[in-house]
């Protein structure tokens, strides 16, 4: 016989709700600190014991609660932060559901002490497993002191899934760092088993970041806005990149989030200068009208939903690119103590590349007619990329260097004040060539050169299929291809800049790139990957002697080139050795 439908007891319902909200000690800490911040606290102290299993205590100097409010706070769906359906659309507080405290109380032994301003005494409430055991008056300062003991004492199945005390304490520490970065105007302290692990005093965001996340990094301000969002914060140079996303601190209206749209926008902006598998150190604060973002889509509120997702994505990417494009870390500029006033950044209209590369390409081709490739009959010998024409003399980091000479015909040695600067000429030429190709592609296609004797290339079945599917991408890149029977294709013309290189190998590399990610990649990303391949093949590998004039021309071209600090694959273009480092190596005083 099938079991009857029954209404769950309040105790069991609270335990189930706690399963969504309270995953581990760090989850409890998050909810309690968010409550403290919503209460206007400017000083928050956290103590834990045994990784939070035995004890979690959060005390603050917020506005506190009356006796009645303190009792209501332990009831499910009791909150002071929303009143109506309309309030859900304009949430600006960190908490709002009224689930956290009753959920925590249902799986622990809890003691709540609170006193509001104007009251002569505070209120102390003890609860066990969600049941209130006592309510008494107590003496205390204005604020709230909340203690959680023996977490998961009545749900042993949850308890056994916790990690070691050190691991749980580390999770709490990561959370405290994120919280402290979100509110540099608030002091935070964190103790584990009586040992102080973190203490920060009120200051500005830059100081807070340098103390908690970027001790050895130079920070550069990010500030810009569009009609979709306002973006502010700081970023560190690529040298400070990490192997995980742990140093990507992103906040929406003051709330820490791990959102795929935001992370994708950040990675797209850093893609030209970061090696694969590396993630930037960045702290971004995204300000949106409350009605433009829905934070009520996930129990932990780490995920959000944007009303205008594409515009927010493009705003973040564009504002970051404005900073990264000039490679400010090469200029040795120190970030100001406070970001400058926001400057407008204009986001291009949303493109269709998010819908898949083929659909995006169709619209791109329809909107921008591609001119026929320009044909050159005679192949020309290799020469380094010509710097783009400039109406004014170029000044900047690279052109300010004094050329010493070449090392093994592969590295350019330069001097700048008290620094020796080594330039990887292949990486530098590759970046210049890439930006030239990108500009050419955007204005009608890459120059093509017809081969006097067409090459034939025997392709595999999958390679031949890739050629047929993506011929309309390969042609603007400068290739003229035609079927020659079976799986054989004839190459009649190639990009001019690779005419003297192994263009058959280049074509195979491009086909592999298209086959791997063509249908899944955004069009801009796919285009850049392909152009980076062409740029790499267009530059002579290995040793290549250069005259001083050519080296100086390359340096000037680098200053006129976007993202000049790195090659298109993310490798650094230059490396500095200071005089002090040399003196230290040679044991000089």
Curated annotation (Swiss-Prot):
Name of one Pfam family that matches: HATPase_c_3
Keyword entries, A-Z: DNA damage, DNA repair
Stretch list, region Disordered: 330-355, 374-394
Residue stretches of biased makeup (Basic and acidic residues): 331-341
A GO biological-process term: mismatch repair
GO molecular function: ATP binding; ATP hydrolysis activity; ATP-dependent DNA damage sensor activity; mismatched DNA binding
Ranges of compositional bias, category Pro residues: 381-390
SUPFAM superfamilies with a match to the protein in the record: ATPase domain of HSP90 chaperone/DNA topoisomerase II/histidine kinase, DNA mismatch repair protein MutL, Ribosomal protein S5 domain 2-like
NCBIfam families: mutl
Cited function: This protein is involved in the repair of mismatches in DNA. It is required for dam-dependent methyl-directed DNA mismatch repair. May act as a 'molecular matchmaker', a protein that promotes the formation of a stable complex between two or more DNA-binding proteins in an ATP-dependent manner without itself being part of a final effector complex.
Protein name: DNA mismatch repair protein MutL
The organism of origin for this protein: Trichlorobacter lovleyi (strain ATCC BAA-1151 / DSM 17278 / SZ) (Geobacter lovleyi)
